[in-house]
A protein has these predicted regions:
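N-terminal non-globular leader segments, chiefly Sec-dependent signal peptides
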Residues: 2-59
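Short, compact, well-ordered microdomains
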Residues: 61-96
Length: 96
């Protein structure tokens, strides 16, 4: 299983994880999710030969693609972090 962060320039960064993916039902729903949820779309993605659901979060200068089950946080310094849900270990920080 991977999270793929797609820059507008076309660079791919893969983060390997054994966890299934991004969940809508985060409680409480963070403010940043409300702000960007109108600019998202759901799509099917092939990962290691298996079709899975993914969510594209469209940012000003790129796309953050996350699988249901991960937590994603956006911070005041315009960075985005992707966390594993079981221990909130930060997998990756993306500066936007």
């Amino acid at each position: 299983m991977m999270i793929v962060i797609l820059y507008s320039m076309g660079t791919y960064i893969s983060i390997k994880s054994t966890v299934n993916a991004f969940r809508y039902g985060i409680d409480p729903i963070p403010e940043w999710f409300d702000k960007i949820s109108q600019r998202t779309k759901e799509l099917d993605v092939m990962v290691d030969g298996h079709k899975v659901k993914a969510l594209d979060i469209i940012l000003e200068n790129g796309i953050l693609r996350a699988f249901y089950g991960y937590y994603i946080g956006m911070y005041p310094d315009d960075s985005i972090q992707v966390f594993r849900p079981e221990d909130f270990h930060s997998l990756y920080t993306l500066k936007i």
